[in-house]
Amino acid sequence: MTKPLVSLLMAAYNNVAYIKNAIDSAKKQTYKNWELIILDDGSDDGTWELAEVLSKGDKRIKVHKNGVNIGYNSTMLKLSGLAKGDFYAHFDSDDMLERYAIEEMLLAFEQLPDVKFIYSDFAQIGKKGEVEHYSPSPTFDPNKLHQHGWRHFGMYRSDVMEHIQGYNEKLASTNGCADGDLFMQIVEKFPAARLPKVLYLYRNHGNNISTKNAKCEACPLRMDCNFARVWCKSANYDITTFKPIEVHHGIEDIRSLEPKN
C-alpha cells in the first residue's frame, strides 16, 4: 500500500543557531515518506547557506529563498504552493520534532478518517535544548472554538485547502498570524482532534515570532482575520469593539428568568 506523503512546511529567518537541530530531527523520523520544504525569508546570518549544505544528499529536503524579506505570512502562503503532500504540517526552523512525530500523527489520522486536523502536546525547550516545561493541549471542543488556537504539532489533510480560503493574503503585513488564521478556517468547517502525546519541541529563545504578535484587540487587521472572526463568534464578542455582546432582556424574558414559586 502506498504510504502518504507528508509535507513539512518550514519558514526560516535568521535561525542559523537552530536550523541544523530542526533538519536533523526531520531526518531522524521513523516515518520516511516526507518532504521538508524550507523557504528562507531573506536571512542575513547564514541560515539559507547552512540549510543548503544540510540538504545535500537527501532529495526529500528542498531549500528555496525569497529575494527579499516578505514576512512569515507571505512566506507560508508561498510554501503551501510548493507542497505536494497528502498531509501538511507546520515546522518552525528553531524547533524540533520527536523522532516518531509523523508516524504517530498518521496512525491517529488512520484511526480517525473523518478528522481533518490533529494537534499534539508539546514541550517547551530552552536555547540549549533543555526541557523547561510540558504543555498539554486542551481536548478539542467544536462548541468552544475561542478556547483553541494553533497548537504544535499541527497536521492537516491537504484536501481541506480546496474548501477554505487558505493562507490569508490580507494578513501579509503581519508577522505571525497565518497559523491561527488557517486553524480557525479548518476547524470551523471540519472535525479536529487532539493527540495527547508530546511530539514537538518548541524552542523559547526570547526572539520568537509568536511573542511579537499583536493581540486581537490591538490588531488593525482583525476585521480581515479568520482567527478573530471565528473567535468572536464562538465567544459572543463584537469583532468591531472586541468586547462581549450585551444581552438585553425584554419584560417577558425577565419574567421567564424569575424563580417559580
Where do the PLM segments sit?
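N-proximal low-complexity "stem/linker" segments adjacent to membrane-targeting elements
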Residues: M1-S25
